[in-house]
Amino acid sequence: MNCSIDATGELDRYIRYPSNWSTIERNFEEIRKLYNANIEIHCTVQMYNILHMDRLIEWALPYKHKIYFNILNHPEYLNIRCLPEELKILAQKKLQPYLDLPKVKGVIDYMWAEDWSRKLDAFKEYTVNLDKSRNQKLTDVVPELSQWV
């Protein structure tokens, strides 16, 4: 059974609005009780969660289920290649302790393969509009992005 979980806590709510993290955790625990359930955690890596992937990994590790990281390709302005260099450095630093997990090195290599920071204006426009429509602020949950929103 694949459980699609992109973040924990309030960041989960932001990405999967109007998700409720305590409900997700409760449901996850119920799934874990199923007899012979082969559970995997699938995470779509994107601009909103790359800087907090370490938190998701730390939440997931005690469960000892496989964690798969899939990279969001569209819309391009949410792709991790759009991160400015200083945030790519920060993301890599936060993921460094988890290089032994499948695909973590691939995520880092992919992120550095190209510079799409020219798309940051589109990222900002989309995020500002999303925040207005939901009465939320990305920077409340990912303050590292405040300079770019």
Model-predicted segments: where are they?
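Radical SAM enzyme core and accessory elements
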Residues: 92, 96-149
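Flexible glycine/acidic-rich beta-alpha junction loops that bind and position SAM and/or redox cofactors
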Residues: 47-51, 66-95, 104-120
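Radical SAM/AdoMet-radical enzyme domain recognition
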Residues: 1-70
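Hydrophobic, Leu/Ile/Phe/Ala-enriched alpha-helical segments that form helix-helix packing faces
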Residues: 28-35, 60-61, 87, 91-98, ...
